[in-house]
Structures are given as structure tokens and as C-alpha cells.
Amino acid sequence: MPADPALPDPVPPGPTAPVPTDYPVRLAVDGAEGPWEALVPGVAALVEQAVLAAVAAGDPSGYGLTPGTPLEISLLLTDDAAVQALNRDYRGQDKPTNVLSFAALDAEEPLPEDGEPVLLGDVALARETVVREAADLGIAPADHVFHLVVHGVLHLLGYDHEEEEEALDMEGLETAILGARGIADPYADARGPEQEGSDR
């Protein structure tokens, strides 16, 4: 029986379905057209899935946010030159990088009133670096984009990798999120066989 044209298409099952989260996310994506869409067809939907997966796994309650609190995230898909400028101006490093995160939430500051959206911050990806890294790693650009967005959003939620224990926690969470989508562990080679079975 043909589908009713008045009804929306069902969400496909499996790893492409949106991940449910207790925190509604208002996501603003800039730059998804043009070169980014050519690189990863459907990139806007892909990055939305990555954001929702990171929020669902990252537990915003650590900031004192209660389930149902709307979260706002801005995501910029741009090029190496723009990311290099951001990296130089805000981090003092005059070079491009794959992803930058600018967290807006501070655990020491008061939260907005109940029901008011909470700005988590901004994430920016550099296209040429993403392409180069994906080629070097032998993985699909779409999988690398998904991983970098997850990584960036986890930074907005307070995760970090400056200390070894923090890095293991963050990498373990990323690996679990990616695994649920069928993406291989990006840290397996760096971890080495002696740590392959460790609790991350």
C-alpha cells in the first residue's frame, strides 16, 4: 500500500535515527551548504544527529540543568582559514585545527530561570583539515565529521582531555557514542594493545 503523501516520511531505523534526549536542543547550523554539502551530502542532518547523541550521553545535569531545559548550540561549518583566525584570536595558536569549541556555560554562574533556554556554546569545524585527516585515517569524511561534532559538544558539556584520566573518560564516551552508530573506535591505535581491554 503506498504511503499517504500527507504524512511525513518515517524516521529510518538504525544508526541514522535521531537519538532521544531529555534536553531539547535548539541547534543553529551555519555553512552546511556548498562545499560542505558536496563533501558530506545531508551534512546538516548528520551534525544534528551528532549533537543530539553527545547531549544524550554527556549528561548536562552536571551543570545543574534539569531534564526538559532547552539547550542552544551554534555549529559553524567553515574552512581552515576561518578556523585558523578563531584559533589565533581566541586561543593564541595561529594555525588551523579540526574542531574548536567555545563553551558559554560556567558552573559557577547562576542558571537562567526555569524554562529559559541555556546557551551551551559554539563549535566550529575546518573543512580542509577534516578532509585531510579523514584521508590519512582511511575513514569516510561523514564519520570523521560525526566524531568531531561529538567531541566538540562534549567540550561544551565540560569534558576535557588535558589530564590522562579526563582524556580516558572523554575518549571512552566518544567511543561508545560512535560505536552505537557503527563507527570504529578512533582511539584504538593510539591506545595500543596493552590498553585495548581497559575500562575507558
UniProtKB/Swiss-Prot annotation:
Q: Which Pfam families does UniProt cross-reference here? A: YbeY (PF02130)
Protein EC: 3.1.-.-
According to its UniProt entry, the protein's GO biological process terms are: rRNA processing
Keyword check for NADP, yes or no. no
Ranges of biased composition (kind: Pro residues)? 1-18
Q: Which residues bind Zn(2+)?
A: 151, 155, 161
The alphabetical list of record keywords is: Cytoplasm, Endonuclease, Hydrolase, Metal-binding, Nuclease, Ribosome biogenesis, rRNA processing, Zinc
Q: Top-level EC class, please?
A: hydrolase
Give the CC-aspect GO terms: cytoplasm
* Keyword Cell division found: no
What this protein needs as a cofactor is: Zn(2+)
In residue numbers, the region (Disordered) covers 1-22
Any idea where this protein resides? Cytoplasm
GO MF annotation terms? metalloendopeptidase activity; RNA endonuclease activity; zinc ion binding
Q: What is its main location?
A: cytoplasm
**Free-text cofactor note:** Binds 1 zinc ion.
- Of which family is this protein a member? Belongs to the endoribonuclease YbeY family.
Name the job this protein performs: Single strand-specific metallo-endoribonuclease involved in late-stage 70S ribosome quality control and in maturation of the 3' terminus of the 16S rRNA.
Q: What's this protein's name?
A: Endoribonuclease YbeY
